[in-house]
Amino acid sequence: MPGKIAVEVAYALPKKQYLQRVTLQEGATVEEAIRASGLLELRTDIDLTENKVGIYSRPAKLSDSVHDGDRVEIYRPLIADPKELRRQRAEKSANK
């Protein structure tokens, strides 16, 4: 008989962070952890078809299993291309 595991689910905004602790059955998935956390109801801007997820900063799939003590992270979409921003900063500093 599978036991219980404790998992944290995190979602960070620039000025507010959400960290929910959930208890799940062993063998639960990333998606089950997110749904159990209640964050989808709290934050309507989270869309699991769009937002990427990870476990301790490593990319994960919604179907991946979680383990006791894991921290599932929901990532916000990038609003700008990092390469483009670096290029713009380099141009700006070169023009000074």
Swiss-Prot record:
It comes from the Bacteria. NCBIfam families: PRK01777.1. Belongs to the UPF0125 (RnfH) family. This is UPF0125 protein YfjF. It comes from Escherichia coli O157:H7.
